Amino acid sequence: MIERGKFRSLTLVNWNGFFARTFDLDELVTTLSGGNGAGKSTTMAAFVTALIPDLTLLHFRNTTEAGATSGSRDKGLHGKLRAGVCYSTLDVVNSRHQRVVVGVRLQQVAGRDRKVDIKPFTIQGLPTAIQPTEILTELVAERQARVLSLPELKERVEAMEGVQFKQFNSITDYHSLMFDLGVIPKRLRSSADRSKFYRLIEASLYGGISSAITRSLRDYLLPENSGVRKAFQDMEAALRENRMTLEAIRVTQSDRDLFKHLISEATSYVAADYMRHANERRIHLDSALVLRRDLFSSRKQLVTEQYRHVEMSRELAEQSGAESDLETDYQAASDHLNLVQTAMRQQEKIERYQSDLEELTYRLEEQSEVVSEASEQQADNEARAEAAELEVDELKSQLADYQQALDVQQTRAIQYQQALQALERARALCQLPELTADNAEEWLETFHAKEQEATESLLQLEQKLSVADAAHSQFEQAYQLVVNIAGEVSRSEAWQTARELLRDWPSQQHLAERVQPLRMRLSELEQRLRAQQDAERLLQEFCKRQGNAYQPEELEALQRELESQVEELSLSVSDAGERRMAMRQELEQLKLKIQELTARAPVWLAAQDALSQLSEQSGEALEDSRQVTEYMQQLLERERETTVERDEIAASKRAIEAQIERLSQPSGAEDARLIALAERFGGVLLSEIYDDVTIDDAPYFSALYGPSRHGIVVPDLSLVREHLQGLDDCPEDLYLIEGDPQSFDDSVFAVEEHEKAVVVKIADRQWRYSRYPEVPLFGRAARENRLETLYQERDRLAERYATLSFDVQKTQRTHQAFSRFIGSHLAVAFDADPEAEIRLLNTRRGEIERALNAHEDQNQQQRQQFDQAKEGISALNRLIPLVSLLLDETLTDRVEEITEELAEAQEAARYIQQHGVSLTKLEPLLSVLQSDPQQHEQLQESYVLAQNSQRLAKQQAFALTEVVQRRAHFSYTDSAGMLTENSDLNDKLRQRLEQAEAERTRAREQLRQYQSQFTQYSQVLASLKSSYDAKRDMLKELSQELVDIGVPADANAEARARARRDELHAALSTNRSRRNQLEKQLTFCEAEMDSLQKKLRKLERDYHQIREQVVNAKAGWCAVMRMVKDNGVERRLHRRELAYMDGDELRSMSDKALGALRLAVADNEHLRDVLRLSEDPKRPERKIQFYIAVYQHLRERIRQDIIRTDDPVEAIEQMEIELGRLTEELTAREQKLAISSKSVSNIIRKTIHREQNRIRMLNQGLQAVSFGQVKSVRLNVNVREAHATLLDVLSEQQEQHQDLFNSNRLTFSEALAKLYQRLNPQMDMGQRLPQTIGEELLDYRNYLELEVEVYRGADGWLRAESGALSTGEAIGTGMSILVMVVQSWEEESRRLRGKDISPCRLLFLDEAARLDAKSIATLFELCERLEMQLIIAAPENISPEKGTTYKLVRKVFQNHEHVHVVGLRGFANEIPSLPPIAAELQQGG
């Protein structure tokens, strides 16, 4: 539910007794309590002044002046104010919770008139915390303040953010804003509305039943319904204009057709040719622009191709130079590969001979061993054979000499004894007590080693001595070997040098063995070095292509960057494809849209022409369809207002004509019946008697006779009495004066003259006071003077009526044009400008085409960047694995190091190869070099020492050897026994002899076999030595040849050389392919440049030709445009919809119009000649001259009495308006005549029924109201009997009175008035016209009677009159009536204000002490039920327990008067009383 707005407070500033006082208003009842003169009425007057600041209405009288009609000139306001600026403001919070401060600035005006100047204003958006007094006053000191002037107040308010200040120069605007904000219940459009509202407030303020309101309850409670009256006014206007319309149509039709046909055909003829030339000029300009654009683009393309040609030529030169270098490198690589292959074949031979040598060496060694073993075996066999021979011989000798054998046994026995002695001797000599026969052999090995060392030393010395003595030639041989190997050395250093050489020989051999691994390692390093160089070359090429210098460690980051770039470019390329497709699709869509807009443009242009015509007709800028419809509504409203004004003018004109007709009656009779009665009574009209009175005396006599100036002067009244019986056809008041018509004077009256007035003593107890009429009509001079004025007024009204009629038809014509526009063009008129859209789309298409070209270029650049990035990534993919290689700064050093090592190894190999044999020969001869034959003495001494050492060692070894040798003797223990046991000795010797002979035979046979085998082995060894020597010589030759080749022949050399050659071959092929590609591209580029140059020359030639055409055509076109603009016909000729037609269509259109124009101007020689001259196609300006001639001709034909323009096109439009106006009037007449009397009756009845129901609803709110003996209040509404009869006849018996409604002489209103008179003949209509009566009968309010009734005690329902009620009852009843009126206004105005606004309700009651407590309680209950605020003034506090009560006491302090105010809030809800309000601020100096 919408919360009702409330008045929060009332603020008085600088009023009498109140300097700056704010009264907080209660939501229900606010009571102002105080004695007489306390300021209660002043407070209420301030409230009313802020609510209705209309000085023509404000009248603050005391209750004692209730019946007074005049008072002081200030009407009670001037005396309530103090000198200076005063304010009265109302603080309101409406239903929207918007705080609004409304008020007035009041100021006394110096002078005797005691006037007050009032300026209303409003403040919106004021914060709640700020009180009105803070805004209206300014503190000067602690207890002093100054009142701000209105400009200062405005400046202060506007300085606050969000606060709006508005000052009003019109009370209507002030009340309009108050109504919109919900402060007042009714929109007060006029002074009459304000008067009603003030009368209501005044009735509320002074209490009682206001006769001004009860007499006009219909005006207060019933809203006006002018729909029926307006409808019949329109119908009657159509009837009056019928004949004039028909005549005007016949007069205007011929001119309109002529104008329209000639203008239409001339416009088509000239505009078609004009637009054709404009189109051709535009086409030529577009062609020139296209050619210029192509020219510039071709020049740009040629420059691009030339730049490409230069770049490709430079690259081709680089590629050619690189190809030469690559061919040289490739040839060198091929030669190197051949050398490597030759070296490899040589190496294979060397390896083969080396393997053969190794095999021969192995076989030679094996054969040597075999020969050595064979020699040893032969020596053993020879020894065994010799031993066997010796044993056989010994056995034979033993057998021959048994005694000798016996001696042998003895000898063995001795040998046994000697063995024991030798053992003891060895123990002593070797100092080995633990020596036994069993371990003697072990000790023998030890002492043999010592002996061997001593022997070796001795042998060395012996060798030296022998060399010195017997082998001097061997020393020379060894020394020569040392010199051959080591160069020149002294003889003394020969042995040391030879020893060092032999000591270094193994290391040299080791180095020689490392040649192959070092060569392989060097090959690997050289390969890495070449790879590094290739990588550096690749890096340099990469940096050159990238245009930046990159370090190897930056390559990985660069690779990531390039991969990211490739990814972005890939996405960009893919997006570019999609975007290109999207742009092409958009381009196609744009082309389709342009085609669609091109097809729609003529329709839109036609709509725009229509819209521009409407704008010119209306004078409004129509920017959207809403404005069109709103303007149509305005047109309807304007048409209604103009029609109403025209009808009012017509009514005034009819009234003046009726008055003229009445004043034109003979003898000055206003009623024709008076003449007949004067003849009947035999009298003379009084006006005829005074017909010759002067115009100066006419006012006096008119006032003198008053109503009897239309009387009849008869000679004898007694004779007239009998004629009065049954007299009905006469005026309502008929004056008969007895007197002589021939000598009549004014002596019959006792007259007393005053200033412009007379007092006529009709009788002793009856006087008549008559003022001089402003327009006297008594006497022929006065009537003629009045008639002259009326004739002038009638002429003025007739002219005004014609103007209004034309305006009505023009408005209707404009409305029809708007209707046609809405029907035909509204759907497209406010669409976007298709031409602007076409321009935008063309611009967009150009942008897209440029963007597409730029996109292609960008895409190509991106592709190039993409390819370059991919190529960079590809190069990086080759470079990244080589980063470690590029970063290997020690590679060159390692290569040099390995190269040095290999050189050393190869040097060692060559050394071994050169001196290996010498070293082999030198090794056994090393000892020879130890002693120089020239150093014999020293050797001799050394030899003696060595001999002594060797002798001792030998003695010890001999002693041990003797023991060892005599180990067999230790087994001769039985030989001692043999000396006694010799019996079987002979047999044993024989057996042993046989065994020895058999053994000798086997030894001889084995010796012969081994001698044969040794001979074979020796032959094989000699053969192997011969083959070995031959192959060794060949190997030396091959090695020398390999050295002469100078190429290492390792296993990977051929692969590296082949890979190098293949790599250079691939690079050479790539270079040749690129060079061929560049040559082809260069050829194509040259061809393209030749083609572009040819195209450029053709474009320049075509551009200069078409530019020359455009320049030549410009002069003629400028002349045409100047002529068109000078004569103001450009808007007529420049028809943009024709721009979308081709030249053939425009020529056809012009030719058709030309044929029609030839027929149209056949009778006009001037136009015919101008038309014939305009047919020259080479002189387009002559067509413009023809069009201007047609315009001039038609301008001369315009009828200025009908058409108010000199423009033929506008004349046609005005003719159309005139014809439309006339036709529409006929149509409107027929339509409005179709309105039946029954429908009028139904409308009035429905309206009456609706209002009766509304009043019944209002009555329900007053049923429980009681004041004193009054228990209830109600409002009765009844239909008048005569009017009810009229409604019944209109709806049920209209056929009986068709003579009235079908009459051409009577309007509907007059017919309705006549019907009312027919139904109620007893009623006197007085002097009112039937039209006026009929218009009153069309107002439903005249059908109703309203009266207020109260239910009082035992009397029941009585009419509410002040005389029948007590004062309190009258006040309560009057308050109830006012509440009903306010509710009615709110209901009536609900549709005019916002739906979220519920207006404030507030009434006043002064001197409320006249109500008893029960009545006061009823008022409180009524306020609570109706959400109404009430301000009560009473001498005493009448209801302190409810509402808010202010106690006002007026005090005088030091000649300064102020009102002391104490506020008390009602304590019914246990709310504590308000603290006393502080004393008034003292007025600032």
UniProtKB/Swiss-Prot annotation:
Q: Which residues bind ATP?
A: 34-41
Single annotated GO MF:
ATP binding
Tell me which InterPro entries the record gives. MukB, MukB/SMC, MukB_hinge, MukB_hinge_sf, MukB_N_dom, P-loop_NTPase
Main localization of the protein described in the UniProt heading: cytoplasm
Region: Flexible hinge; residue ranges are 666-783
Question: Cellular component terms, GO, for this chain's entry?
Answer: cytoplasm; nucleoid
Q: Coiled-coil regions in this chain?
A: 337-480, 509-605, 835-915, 977-1116
Ligase in keyword set:
no
Question: What family does this belong to?
Answer: Belongs to the SMC family. MukB subfamily.
- Complexes and interactors: Homodimerization via its hinge domain. Binds to DNA via its C-terminal region. Interacts, and probably forms a ternary complex, with MukE and MukF via its C-terminal region. The complex formation is stimulated by calcium or magnesium. Interacts with tubulin-related protein FtsZ.
| UniProt keyword DNA-binding present | yes
Name this polypeptide is given: Chromosome partition protein MukB
Task: Report the protein's function.
Answer: Plays a central role in chromosome condensation, segregation and cell cycle progression. Functions as a homodimer, which is essential for chromosome partition. Involved in negative DNA supercoiling in vivo, and by this means organize and compact chromosomes. May achieve or facilitate chromosome segregation by condensation DNA from both sides of a centrally located replisome during cell division.
Q: Where in the cell is it found?
A: Cytoplasm, Nucleoid
- Source organism per UniProt: Yersinia pseudotuberculosis serotype O:3 (strain YPIII)
Pfam families in the record, alphabetically?
MukB, MukB_hinge, SbcC_Walker_B
Q: Which GO terms describe its biological process?
A: cell division; chromosome condensation; chromosome segregation; DNA replication
| Notes on the domains | The hinge domain, which separates the large intramolecular coiled coil regions, allows the homodimerization, forming a V-shaped homodimer.
Alphabetized UniProt keyword annotations: ATP-binding, Cell cycle, Cell division, Chromosome partition, Coiled coil, Cytoplasm, DNA condensation, DNA-binding, Nucleotide-binding
